[in-house]
Amino acid sequence: MKEFLAVGEIINTHGIKGEVKVYPLTDDMKRFKKLKEVFIDGEGRKILSCKLQPNNVVLKIEGIDSIEEANKYRKKLLEIKRENSVKLPKGSYFIADLIECRVIDENGREIGQISDVIKTGSNDVYEVKGKSEVLVPAIKDIVTNIDIENKTVTIKPLEIWQCE
């Protein structure tokens, strides 16, 4: 499992004093208010202030003190150490842990690897790339087992639930 988890991406500067606008990669934007430190390219930096906006977060990060300096961080991911992440309820997983999991059906047939997790509102959908691309609804009726430690997701055979 990855040591760091991405919680946001710097998408723009904000103001002239080095604040950055962050697109959250988490379901709970309010968690940014509790963060004391983030990692950018593996380097830990303190969060000095946080302002929540409707769809973004504005952060003042230690060591970024001008608009010119902030501009250098566009498109950079903000990460946290796994041990500082939110505790997930049983049966929930971090997207970073699902990506690249091998997907097999209950008969042991290889389907492919999870390349993306799509948020649909009602349930997530796993994008699985193999011989062809398959979209797998992340629901208990289809996904029968998730083994993060062994990077394996087991699903019911495609012919049972997939329409031709």
Curated annotation (Swiss-Prot):
Domain of life the protein comes from: Bacteria
Entry comment, domain topic: The PRC barrel domain binds ribosomal protein uS19.
Protein source organism: Clostridium botulinum (strain Langeland / NCTC 10281 / Type F)
Pfam families reported in the protein's UniProt record: PRC_RimM (PF24986), RimM (PF01782)
Name of the featured protein: Ribosome maturation factor RimM
Single Gene Ontology MF annotation: ribosome binding
One GO BP annotation of this record: rRNA processing
Domain PRC barrel per the UniProt entry, residue ranges: 90-161
GO cellular component: cytoplasm; ribosome
Subcellular location: Cytoplasm
PANTHER family for the chain: RIBOSOME MATURATION FACTOR RIMM
Primary gene name: rimM
NCBIfam families: 16S_RimM (TIGR02273)
Similarity comment: Belongs to the RimM family.
Keywords in alphabetical order: Chaperone, Cytoplasm, Ribosome biogenesis, rRNA processing
Physiological role: An accessory protein needed during the final step in the assembly of 30S ribosomal subunit, possibly for assembly of the head region. Essential for efficient processing of 16S rRNA. May be needed both before and after RbfA during the maturation of 16S rRNA. It has affinity for free ribosomal 30S subunits but not for 70S ribosomes.
Subunit note: Binds ribosomal protein uS19.
